[in-house]
């Protein structure tokens, strides 16, 4: 399959690095070793990519070109639990080589990213083995207790590394409590947000750009279909006090009241009245979004968020994404 090919092509690229890495120990500076740690990180990443899609797989732990014969390529798969442990071992090696986030402000793979990745792998495989025991998809040996224990151990290590959540108290640009959450997704520079351990910096001047904000503002995510957040997603957000909502309550028939007293992350994620709709186009002089009940009197000022457009530029639900647009 395409995913199988993608995973192993990327693993070959990483192992090509290991095959031709010839730096003498005396010249292995901390910067050189950190780059070596990045290779271990990505070898773990692509094995995890394959594990989550296929389960037990052949482990590509070396450069295979010397075995590029019909017989040499018949590498038997390892049990999924052994694959997971191989991934965790690579991430542990990466952790010991990588710089901390502070060195490059999150612009390169860092020690903290390796720990978080290891937690994700251990949690994924641990829960898989726990809940698939006795099925055709079970690991040969149930190691869920050990894997889930590793999550706790790694978490304790991560908590001592000085990362901090981006909150209204720490974010000088946050006016409302939800702003700090939104800024994680719509800020141009995440250097000082230590909660973001690995990110990519975009710059028009440097030619590093993307179209996501423009696409989302126009009502679509990609060219394959219309956008629109689902009702069930909106219903899953709690009230600000942590209690769940009852979607059957009459208050939620009113679009504006739907957002009253709700978790700030809902307000940061979904367009509602007073948001700057499609603010990614400065020349349009966008006004704040206004949602009112339709009538003949106000039909000129109330515009639905692309409900009636055609093709992919259409919102299929009426819940238009705000995250990464209203900046």
Regions found by a protein language model. Name each.
Residues 1, 57, 61, 91-93, ...:
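An aromatic- and glycine-enriched ligand-binding surface/loop that stacks and positions planar moieties
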Residues 1-54, 70-106, 253-255, 260-261, ...:
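Conserved, well-structured interaction surfaces
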Residues 39, 43, 118, 151-155:
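Short amphipathic alpha-helical coiled-coil/interface segments
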Residues 60-68:
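Short, conserved phosphate-binding/catalytic loop or strand-edge motifs used
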Residues 105-114:
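Aromatic-lined, polymer-binding surfaces characteristic
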């Amino acid at each position: 399959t395409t995913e199988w090919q993608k995973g192993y092509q990327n693993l070959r690229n990483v192992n090509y690095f290991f095959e031709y890495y010839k730096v003498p120990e005396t010249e292995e500076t901390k910067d050189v070793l950190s780059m070596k740690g990045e290779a271990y990180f990505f070898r773990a990443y692509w094995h995890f990519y394959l594990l989550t899609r296929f389960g037990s797989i052949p482990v590509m732990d070396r450069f295979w070109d010397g075995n590029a014969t019909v017989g040499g390529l018949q590498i038997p798969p390892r049990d999924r639990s052994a694959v997971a442990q191989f991934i965790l071992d690579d991430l542990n090696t990466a952790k010991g080589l990588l710089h901390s986030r502070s060195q490059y402000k999150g612009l390169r793979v860092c020690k903290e990213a390796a720990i978080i990745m290891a937690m994700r792998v251990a949690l994924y495989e641990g829960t898989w083995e726990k809940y698939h025991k006795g099925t055709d998809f079970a690991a040969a040996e149930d190691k869920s207790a050990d894997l889930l224990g590793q999550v706790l151990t790694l978490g304790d290590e991560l908590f001592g590394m000085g990362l901090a959540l981006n909150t209204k108290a720490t974010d000088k640009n946050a006016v409302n409590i939800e702003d700090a959450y939104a800024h994680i997704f719509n800020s141009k520079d995440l250097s000082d947000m230590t909660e973001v351990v690995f990110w990519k910096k975009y710059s028009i001047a440097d030619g590093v750009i993307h179209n996501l904000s423009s696409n989302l503002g126009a009502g679509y995510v990609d060219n394959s279909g219309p956008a629109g957040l689902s009702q069930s997603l909106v219903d899953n957000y709690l009230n600000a006090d942590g209690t769940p909502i009852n979607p059957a309550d009459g208050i939620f028939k009113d679009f504006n009241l739907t957002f009253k007293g709700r978790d700030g992350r809902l307000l940061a994620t979904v367009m509602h009245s007073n948001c700057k709709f499609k603010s990614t186009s400065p020349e349009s002089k966008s006004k704040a979004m206004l949602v009112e009940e339709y009538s003949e009197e106000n039909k000129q000022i109330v515009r639905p968020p692309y409900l009636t457009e055609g093709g992919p530029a259409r919102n299929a639900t009426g819940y238009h994404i705000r995250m990464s647009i209203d900046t």
